[in-house]
Structures are given as C-alpha cells and as structure tokens.
C-alpha cells in the first residue's frame, strides 16, 4: 500500500516520531532540549509532509529557521541526522510500498543532507544566520 492520503501521512509521521522520542541518539533533543509539545508539533509535521508528498499547500513555515534555533541549543551533527533518516526510512518501509513511499524516503534524505550542510556551515562560522 502506498501513501495516498493525509491519514497515511498521519500514520507514518506519528509512528516515526514515536521511534524518534525513544531513540538514544536524538530522542533527548526533542524531549529534553526542545521539550516538544507533540500535540502542536505533529499537525505541523503532517502539513509539512502533505505539502511535500501530496502537493497540498499546507505548510508555510520556515523549516530551516526552526532547526537553526535547535542548533544553537545543541549542535546538530551528522550522527543526529543519520539517526533521523534511518528511523524515517525504517518506519516508511514498515508501513508503505510504492512510488510515493519511495519519494518520501528520497525527500527525507535530501532534507537531512541540506540540514546537515547548513548546520555545519553555521557551526563552522561560515554563515551569519538571523532568523
């Protein structure tokens, strides 16, 4: 079964973040550093992925800016993004197969790569970010 509806995205993202919260490499970032309010965060993530995967314009925030805020509290490193992408791919593979599921994994890899690149630039003092 492929990802075709918002309900599919809600299932994927809910299960994914259940894994994230328990992960020894990145769970603490969400639980302790950022103290994420999941009732608020999950619907935003549903919108984000619905925008990316189903071409519904639901997400209009600045995703990069939010991650710069996180990076200023704790330096986001390759190991963090590696855990994130590994969990995302594992969760997607457990739940879905098909063209959109493959696109979700590809987009997630691209997002992780760009985020890591941008965080590394900031951590090395190569950019001035005022977001």
What do these predicted regions represent?
Residues 1-131:
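Core of compact, soluble alpha-helical bundle domains
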């Amino acid at each position: 079964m492929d990802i075709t509806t918002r309900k599919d995205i809600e299932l994927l993202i809910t299960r994914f973040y259940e894994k994230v919260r328990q992960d020894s490499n990145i769970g603490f970032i969400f639980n302790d550093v950022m103290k994420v309010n999941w009732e608020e965060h999950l619907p935003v993530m549903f919108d984000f992925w619905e925008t990316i995967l189903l071409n519904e314009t639901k997400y209009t925030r600045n995703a990069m800016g939010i991650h710069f805020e996180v990076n200023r509290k704790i330096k986001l490193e390759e190991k963090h993004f590696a855990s994130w992408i590994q969990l995302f791919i594992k969760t997607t593979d457990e739940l879905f197969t098909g063209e959109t599921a493959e696109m979700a994994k590809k987009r997630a890899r691209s997002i992780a790569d760009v985020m890591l690149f941008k965080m590394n630039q900031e951590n090395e003092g190569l950019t001035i970010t005022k977001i």
